[in-house]
């Protein structure tokens, strides 16, 4: 699971 995707979800 990519950590980058997790951060993007937090931005939204």
UniProtKB/Swiss-Prot annotation:
Q: Which GO terms describe its cellular component?
A: extracellular region
What does the UniProt entry say about where the protein is found?
Answer: Secreted
Found, by tissue, as follows: Expressed by the skin glands.
At the top level, the lineage of the source is Eukaryota
Keywords attached to this Swiss-Prot or TrEMBL record, sorted alphabetically, are: Secreted
What is the protein name stated in its UniProt record? Skin secreted peptide P4-1
């Amino acid at each position: 699971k990519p950590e980058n995707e997790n951060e993007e979800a937090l931005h939204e």
